[in-house]
């Protein structure tokens, strides 16, 4: 019998998560029925959205999340033993599936690309960057793009795609190391928002004419400051609000309505699951090719050991990661 280890939500978060919010449980999995497969986690993802999505869980539920897994036993001809898949299986070491929700990695996946990239640049974060910038913002060559949390899994890809499309790109991050990383990726301007004397002045200096597009990963007062410097007909893709996820007080006031009205701005929130089927597959293929050709670089912040899932999650929320946070099981 296979023993599956799973991280569960012991207690709902109040403010920033702590070790006490999580509990590691072990369960014995039953034998496979016809049509089922046994999966072993290889790499697991931790992402900011999990902080908010956990509100929908009951205490005792398994933490949600995507993983790259290997089929170690199969009674389903569509997924023979050894098949590598990506799936929303949660924080668990082993699981049983009937095949629904399992996505095989593309057959053309280059050998030189780590499988873990299916959780990052060639997965949900990369798709979020791709569709948020190209569809929601509708970016055009020659425009100026502002990216917050630019050294993260999504922001770093946003900036690089914007450069591929011929844009000027400004990015912000929370450490000098991350700023150096952004410049290495090709960002035209990058600065540490924690050390500048005035965020408003730093934004103005980076782009005196303002911003055509803002890819918002942080929300809060930071984003209010950016919105004040948007050009007329500017577009804002609201992807995340990581600065607000652990708040215990009231939500801060949003941008002044008159700014949005008179600058004729368009603000749109989005979730990447909106794009499915052929358009999603086409985007994944393009991302995979960009990475394989060296046009898009990616950095993974890897934590070794399934038992360190909560630590990796909390570290990501603190901004300890450079690029995509991954746990290697």
Curated annotation (Swiss-Prot):
Can you tell me which residues bind NADP(+)? 152-155, 178, 193, 217, 239-245, 270-272, 321
Q: Where in the cell is it found?
A: Cytoplasm
Residue numbers bearing the N6-acetyllysine modification: 178
Q: Which InterPro entries match?
A: ADH-like_C (IPR013149), ADH_N_2 (IPR041694), GroES-like_sf (IPR011032), MDR_fam (IPR045010), NAD(P)-bd_dom_sf (IPR036291), PKS_ER (IPR020843), PTGR1 (IPR014190)
Molecular function (GO) terms for this protein are: 13-lipoxin reductase activity; 15-oxoprostaglandin 13-oxidase [NAD(P)+] activity; 2-alkenal reductase (NADPH) activity; leukotriene B4 12-hydroxy dehydrogenase activity
EC numbers, comma separated? 1.3.1.48, 1.3.1.74
* Residues with Phosphothreonine modification: 18
Where it mainly occurs, coarsely classed, is cytoplasm
The name on file for this protein is Prostaglandin reductase 1
Indicate the quaternary assembly: Monomer or homodimer.
Q: Which residues carry this modification: N6-(2-hydroxyisobutyryl)lysine?
A: 178
Family the UniProt entry places it in: Belongs to the NADP-dependent oxidoreductase L4BD family.
Reaction catalysis annotation: 13,14-dihydro-15-oxo-prostaglandin E1 + NADP(+) = 15-oxoprostaglandin E1 + NADPH + H(+); 13,14-dihydro-15-oxo-prostaglandin E2 + NADP(+) = 15-oxoprostaglandin E2 + NADPH + H(+); 13,14-dihydro-15-oxo-prostaglandin F1alpha + NADP(+) = 15-oxoprostaglandin F1alpha + NADPH + H(+); 13,14-dihydro-15-oxo-PGF2alpha + NADP(+) = 15-oxoprostaglandin F2alpha + NADPH + H(+)
Keyword vocabulary terms for this entry: Acetylation, Cytoplasm, Fatty acid metabolism, Hydroxylation, Lipid metabolism, NADP, Oxidoreductase, Phosphoprotein, Prostaglandin metabolism
In terms of CDD domains, this protein maps to: leukotriene_B4_DH_like
Choose any GO biological process term that the UniProt entry carries and state it.
lipoxin A4 metabolic process
Identify the species of origin.
Answer: Mus musculus
Q: Which gene encodes it?
A: Ptgr1
Q: Which GO terms describe its cellular component?
A: cytoplasm
Please provide an example of a Pfam family that matches this protein in its UniProt record. Answer: ADH_zinc_N
**Record function comment:** NAD(P)H-dependent oxidoreductase involved in metabolic inactivation of pro- and anti-inflammatory eicosanoids: prostaglandins (PG), leukotrienes (LT) and lipoxins (LX). Catalyzes with high efficiency the reduction of the 13,14 double bond of 15-oxoPGs, including 15-oxo-PGE1, 15-oxo-PGE2, 15-oxo-PGF1-alpha and 15-oxo-PGF2-alpha. Catalyzes with lower efficiency the oxidation of the hydroxyl group at C12 of LTB4 and its derivatives, converting them into biologically less active 12-oxo-LTB4 metabolites.
- Signal among keywords: no
